[in-house]
Every structure is written in structure tokens, then in C-alpha cells.
């Protein structure tokens, strides 16, 4: 219980740093946004209790609607708050996709396992929706937060989409084979490692806060800029780690087949 509360506090802190120094919002706005998004993620977690179900479970149209509505609530909230604070449409899109693609999916291990395990039972229209969000959302995020260049952002978005597809293709083949093993040869083992890696993000919030205090005391604005670049580097490092883990999943699947 204490660990979960601490994680929530660190998550709020990390988001606060993001809004304050990357999105350039005010202190009160950043704090409010951080709390709102953490609460939204908790609501989303409650809606996804059915994540405990295994591959034999088939989603009903009502449950698919719940997923879409819960995700849309995060996205619409991003747009609304951005407009209220005087932001541009691109900023609203970037914030919305950022929380869908990078925070919500990787923050919740149950969500990740549900997506992978229930992949064969998902309605095709829902899969298209997922794919579209990953491709377009990743491109927008890379453009707004990392590169600022359209071509580079499109390439990075396509690579992210390719990883998304390869992971699900690996898992689909593995799930439909009916063979599950609790070892490193199980692709899900690698997916859990991704989640644990992403959860290290709150530690960046602590480091960013320390950097901010140091910057204010020494009046060195470059330290704040360093914090922003650290955040951007974290996004890129995440993609690199996912690449490595995807390769590991593929090799693990091959080893398991030979065994």
C-alpha cells in the first residue's frame, strides 16, 4: 500500500516537472494537470479489472466501448485543458497522444498483459483504432517533444508502429501455440521488463526537482534546459529498450520452439 501511494506521489511529481518545464505551464496549472491525469489513470485502472481474464475470454461490444470511452476521456481532457490554458491544437494533440501512448499503456502492467493476451479475440475495428493511435500518436509526440522536424518524426513514428506490430505478432504466434512457460523464453517476461523500466520515470521527477532547485539557487537556466532534454532523451531511450526487448522476445520464441 505504501509503495503504491509513493508511486502515485512520484507520478504526480514527474508529470508536474513535465508540464512546468517541457510544456511551459504555470505552477498551479502544472500541479492541477498532474493530479487530474493521475486520477484519470486510476479510473482507467478500475475500468480494466477484466485484465485478469486470459486469452480464452472474448470482449463484448460493451466492454470495448468502455475501453474507448476511458481512453477518449484522457484525450479529450488533454485537448480541453490545453485550449483553456491558451495552447495550440498541436499541443493538445501531443499531450493527448503522449498520455495514451507513453503513460497509460506502459504505466499499467495489467493493461499491457491484457492487450497482449487477448489480442486474438479483439474486434478488428478495435485493433485498427489501436494501430492508428500508435502510429499517428507517436509521430505527433516525437514532433512536439523530441525532434521538431516533420520527416524525422514520421520516421520515428513508423519505427514505433513497427515495434508495436512486431510485439503483437510475436505474442499472437506464442498465444495461439498454446505453450506458455514462465521463463525468459516467454515474450511476456520481456514485456514486464518494459513496464519496470518505464516505472523508473518517477525517479527522473526527483532528479528534475533537484536540478530545478540548483538552477534557481545558482540562477543557471541551462540546468532547466538540461532537465527538458533529459525527458526527451528518456523517450528515445524507451524506444531503444523496446527494440532490444523485441529482439529478445523473437530469440526467446525461437529457442522455445526448438525446445
Swiss-Prot record:
Q: Which domain of life is it from?
A: Archaea
Q: How does it sit in the membrane?
A: Multi-pass membrane protein
Q: Which residues form the signal peptide?
A: none
Tell me if Amino-acid biosynthesis is a UniProt keyword of this record.
Answer: no
Ranges annotated as spanning the membrane? 9-31, 84-106, 126-148, 153-175, 196-215, 230-252
Subcellular location, record wording? Cell membrane
Q: Which GO terms describe its cellular component?
A: plasma membrane
Keywords associated with the record: Cell membrane, Membrane, Transmembrane, Transmembrane helix
Q: What is this protein called?
A: Uncharacterized protein AF_1569
